[in-house]
Amino acid sequence: GKIANNATSRRAVLELASERLSGFTEETATTYSMQRGHDDEAFAIEVYSEKVAPVRRVGFVTNDEYGLLIGCSPDGLVGEDGGVECKSRLHAIQLQTIIDGVVPDEFKVQVHFSMLVSGRPWWDFMSVPAFGGGKMMLLKVEPDQSMKSLLIDAAHECERRVQAAMTEYQNRIADGSLRLLDMPRREPEISD
């Protein structure tokens, strides 16, 4: 693997830099699919807790042992040494996921990063059918040293890019070439 340098990774760098500079986190709209996934995750974790092992829900977990602060929001921790990552899948996609019998590529980094941050030696990847009514697939994932090294390198590169973006922004403000006005913060209106 290699460290991403694409539109998505560049946007993530700018989001981190802007959060640090402004102190604000941008809100994102919740779509129907996102809400369904959230609801399915909660239900699946109840089933897992009942049939496999209790899951402790946690907030944001951090780790600074790699020379910088990294963090993640795992779906849950299991006992003293494990964790879970739950993904809700439309039934046809769940069928293919079960046939393939592996963690889908789009979730591997997330699972391994959760293990890296938490320092836990295993993670259960849970793939569940949307709205239930089918088979939940559990795959136990253990750390991969090459993935761990790549993630640590990527975290350092991300931090370098965030710092560079912040410096470029501050330099642009200081050089006087733009007309800039301070904007007061406006709180979003919440409608019922």
Residue ranges and their predicted role:
Residues G1-D192:
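Accessory terminal regions of nucleic-acid processing enzymes
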